[in-house]
Amino acid sequence: MTAEYSMLPRATLTRSGRERMPAAVRGRTAEIQRMIGRCLRAVTDLKGLDGFTVRIDCDVIQADGGTRTACVTGAFVALAEALALLKGSGRLEKIPLLDTVAAVSVGLVGGEPYLDLCYEEDARAEVDLNLAMTGKGLWVEIQGTAENEPFATEKMSAMMGLGTEGIERLTQTQRIALKGLRLE
């Protein structure tokens, strides 16, 4: 199971070039693709996919905030829909999902935690944190960086708490979107 991540040329304030060949995949893109893939594999019974390769396309059309975390959340919905289609066609005996997964970005701006920072907030952030969690509340991915100065454990706890709340809301939205698929 893998994911391909790409930002369309006008997804950012200034146009960026396309990454056309696999050899041209830049470090940031490769890192994001690996993160998305790890998150999806963490909630999938890979033995239940025996004989199948699943590739999820994550195309960013507007990059104003946490694109990698938005891709994790959306990629899970796409995966669930694809697996439900395979089960519905008789190609899978059951849907091999163990749980849901969603992700958010959290930042520290002016000493305060912010959820899902926009570009301007991200540019001012003292700390950048990406969090991915299962629907059962288990951590899949925690990536964090202090931009200029170290930060206290209390600030990390506040960001993790805010991130958890955001992920719980996204998980509910995923469940609503996938309600008719009978994923059990």
Protein language model features and the residues they cover:
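A structural signal for small-residue-enriched, beta-sheet-centric alpha/beta enzyme cores
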Residues: 27, 47-48, 66-70, 80-84, ...
